[in-house]
UniProtKB/Swiss-Prot annotation:
Localisation: Endoplasmic reticulum; Nucleus envelope
Annotated organism of origin: Mus musculus (Mouse)
Positions bearing carbohydrate: 356, 451
Name of the protein: GH3 domain-containing protein
Any Pfam family hit: GH3_N_vert
Keywords annotated in UniProt: Endoplasmic reticulum, Glycoprotein, Nucleus, Signal
Length: 532
């Protein structure tokens, strides 16, 4: 108990010290003070992380009891009226009184009468705090020098760490401490710091936008650095930036920051494509780490294994309360009843169902996971697809994974092409099927290819037929027309993401990237930027 009180006292004192130290310029602080600040911060962080690790281990050793406690907590804290008794509610009563409901599968919906998400990121709940504290400790163990003072920079206004700890960035001596800043200023701060070991961005797609923008505005940024826009004239660093950019995108991050070890982004739906592009081009040779997986209900899974490249996540038994809805093998139909975490079976696929006290609703997220292992009694999963990102023009179901694999195979047959981004639109959205069979309209942004031949366009349709027997049958009968591929100019998807953010009714939505667009004005936004 005494140790807990000491920890709480430190938690109160360090933010105050960080604010006081922040008032002094970076150059005015003596080295011993910076070192002391860093040691105190890591001491606190280690204590807090050890406490969270103990709580996580205890809860995952008795998952049934932990989930029952989480459910009781949600019922007690539920806002407004509740149709359930607050005490002694078993799972059968819970399921009978609260039917499953749908939540938004993407950031844009045709109907505005959608149910609210059960929680709002950035991000509430034990899972968010655990993801941040345990993620930092895990990252430091994997890369011991990565979080030394001045070794980390975030190039987006929002951090990838789910739980915002205002003093942490200052206490750990980050180049870009937490707090809303202009993205250009954040990038400049990172560029003038050649000793970076960790590069952070909220999501992979946002980091992709940063690198595309860096290439486009590199000359202007170099001039700003040389002119000392951040307070110090740095002509040598400006020359290094120009030289690095002249060598092209492949390996650019390592040329800018020779000591760089790892890229930290927050994983969510639709990020895998951006990660793949970053790995092949700008961030070649670097490790990637995501502390958590964020969905419509906030943080739903923790990453305790930075060494695993596939992205394995632990489903914790706390709040939000998680149920698993089995997916029937070979289809995207769901079973009649949900399961608890203890009932999950290895290699099986499930849709996540979340309940939180904010909105006492059993929300089907649409995020599908496959169980790949266990941590104590809790399932370790891999996120496979989102049910809301399926294509269907004639009753077929082409899910996100099937389409992405087919597209990757097709792009692999386009000489010199690297896929940066894509979205699909069903032809009815653009009224482009008049006089022809309904089909898929596919918009892609590429690197290394400026024009698409008809032969290359046809390869996507061939790959789709190989990937889906149902699609092949419909194509053979003429019920579905060939997929049409459109190449858009660089930066088009950044414009799309800005439009999605403006269209979103809440700034707290998770940073998902839709792969199927169902609103005409968003599809037309890309249509206007087609170059081939």
């Amino acid at each position: 108990m005494l140790l807990l009180w000491l920890l709480l006292l430190l938690l109160l004192l360090v933010p105050l010290l960080a604010i006081l130290w922040q008032q002094r310029s970076r150059g005015a602080r003596p080295c011993w003070l910076i070192s002391l600040q860093h040691r105190v911060a890591w001491g606190m962080l280690g204590w807090a992380a050890a406490w969270q690790q103990w709580r996580l281990d205890r809860s995952t050793l008795n998952v049934g009891q932990s989930q029952q406690q989480a459910l009781m907590w949600c019922l007690k804290k539920a806002q407004g009226s509740c149709c359930l008794p607050r005490e002694d509610t078993d799972m059968r009563t819970f399921r009978n009184h609260l039917p499953l409901t749908q939540t938004s599968h993407t950031q844009e919906q045709e109907s505005e009468e959608t149910l609210p998400s059960p929680a709002s990121p950035q991000y509430h709940g034990d899972a968010s705090l655990q993801a941040t504290l345990l993620g930092l400790i895990t990252l430091n163990k994997a890369y011991p020098e990565a979080l030394a003072p001045g070794s980390t920079a975030c190039v987006t206004p929002t951090s990838p760490w789910p739980c915002s700890v205002p003093w942490l960035g200052h206490a750990l001596g980050r180049v870009s401490p937490d707090g809303a800043k202009d993205p250009r200023t954040l990038l400049l701060e990172a560029l003038i710091s050649p000793g970076l070991r960790v590069l952070e961005a909220r999501t992979a797609v946002e980091l992709l936008d940063v690198f595309v923008g860096l290439e486009a505005d590199g000359e202007e940024l170099a001039e700003a650095i040389a002119a000392g826009i951040l307070g110090t004239l740095l002509p040598k660093r400006a020359a290094e930036l120009k030289e690095a950019l002249e060598q092209g995108p492949r390996g650019l991050a390592r040329r800018l920051w020779p000591k760089l070890q790892v890229v930290v982004t927050l994983d969510s739906g639709g990020q895998a494509e951006a990660v793949a592009a970053l790995r092949v081009l700008w961030c070649q040779g670097l490790a990637f780490f995501s502390p958590a997986y964020a969905a419509s209900g906030g943080v739903v899974a923790l990453n305790l294994w930075p060494e695993r490249p596939q992205g394995s996540y632990l489903l914790p038994p706390g709040v939000p309360f998680i149920e698993l809805l089995p997916i029937k093998e070979g289809t995207q139909e769901e079973a009649a009843s949900t399961l608890l975490l203890t009932d999950a079976q290895r290699e099986k696929e499930y849709e996540l169902v979340l309940t939180n006290h904010t909105s006492l609703t059993r929300c089907r997220l649409g995020d599908v996971v496959q169980v790949v292992g266990t941590y104590n009694q809790c399932p370790v999963v891999r996120f496979t697809c989102r049910l809301g990102q399926t294509l269907n023009v004639r009753g077929e179901v082409t899910d996100e994974t099937v389409f992405s694999v087919a597209l990757a195979q097709a792009v692999g047959q386009w000489p010199g092409a690297k896929l940066l981004d894509h979205v699909c639109v069903e032809s009815r959205v653009l009224d482009s099927c008049e006089g022809s069979a309904p089909h898929y309209e596919v918009f892609v942004e590429l690197r290394g290819l400026r024009n698409l031949s008809e032969e290359n366009r046809d390869k996507l349709d061939n790959c789709l037929q190989e990937a889906s027997a149902q699609y092949k049958s419909l194509r053979f009968r003429g019920s579905v027309g060939p997929a049409k591929v459109h190449l858009v100019r660089p930066g088009s998807f950044r414009v799309l993401r800005e439009a999605l953010a403006a269209f979103s009714s809440s700034s707290c939505r998770p940073p998902e990237m839709p792969r199927v667009i169902r609103l005409r004005h968003l599809a037309q936004l890309l249509q206007k930027r087609v170059i081939s």
